[in-house]
A protein has these predicted regions:
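Conserved phosphate-binding loops in N-terminal lobes of ATP-dependent enzymes
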Residues: 1-15, 19
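Alpha-helical scaffold segments in soluble metabolic enzymes
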Residues: 3-6, 56-64, 119-123, 133, ...
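Short, glycine- and charge-enriched coil/turn segments that flank and shape catalytic ligand pockets
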Residues: 10, 64-71, 126-132, 160-166
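Short glycine-enriched loops at secondary-structure junctions
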Residues: 19-22, 141
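Glycine-rich phosphate-binding loop of actin/hexokinase-like ATP-binding domains
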Residues: 23-126
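Conserved active-site and cofactor/substrate-binding residues in soluble primary-metabolism enzymes
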Residues: 48, 52-56, 83, 114-118, ...
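Beta-strand segments within the central parallel beta-sheet cores of soluble alpha/beta enzyme folds
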Residues: 71-77, 132-141
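Adenine-nucleotide phosphate-binding core of ATP-dependent small-molecule kinases
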Residues: 136, 140-149, 153-186
């Protein structure tokens, strides 16, 4: 902000918070089943991400079907190297696949999405991985990249079309997770 202000002193600045759209989620959707003090004292809860995208897509869908956004119940998907799903009821986010961080949820280009929370403990114990290494593994070496060695969906689709089993698996795992979230939001 300071650099932009120095470089463009006469240009208004606007801050957009990617999590803001998800602030309408009910407590049952944003709270984790962990001790209450972790939420109250440390803010450990689900925040969601890609809110600007989900809000735009929801409003655009409402326009296309000719219905006020506030009367729409929708499931929106943000699909790219980062990916998320959001349930919208009456124009408000009521659930989303990403949690406290973007790591939770759908399979992404390099992020694993949902996994058993004990997997990092297992990897730490059996492989001696520290927190920094685990964070890098789950955020930057997993997802599509971890499943098939590539995080470009166009290349993965091409490889799958050519019979590459790892690429087929990556597409299958991604589709399974998408169907799981969409089904939960119906």
């Amino acid at each position: 902000i300071l650099v932009a202000r120095a470089l463009f002193p006469d240009t208004p600045q606007v801050a957009v918070f990617d999590t803001a759209f998800h602030q309408t989620m009910p407590r049952a959707a944003y709270r984790y089943a962990i001790p209450d003090y972790l939420y109250r004292e440390h803010g450990v809860r689900r925040y969601g991400f890609h809110g600007t995208s989900h809000h735009y897509v929801g409003r655009r869908a409402a326009d296309l079907i000719g219905k006020p956004f506030g009367r729409c119940n929708l499931i929106t998907l943000h699909l790219g190297n980062g990916a998320s799903a959001t349930a919208i009821q009456g124009g408000s986010s009521i659930d989303t696949s990403m949690g406290m961080t973007p790591l939770e949820g759908l399979v992404m280009g390099t992020r694993c999405g949902d996994i058993d929370p004990a997997v990092p403990f297992y990897l730490s114990k059996h492989l001696g991985l520290d927190n920094s290494t685990l964070e890098n593994l789950l955020n930057r070496q997993s997802g599509l990249l971890g499943l098939c060695g590539d995080n470009d969906m166009r290349e993965i689709q091409r490889r799958a079309d050519d019979g590459d089993e790892a690429a087929e698996l990556a597409l299958g795992v991604t589709a399974h997770r998408l169907k799981k979230y969409i089904g939960a939001y119906l």
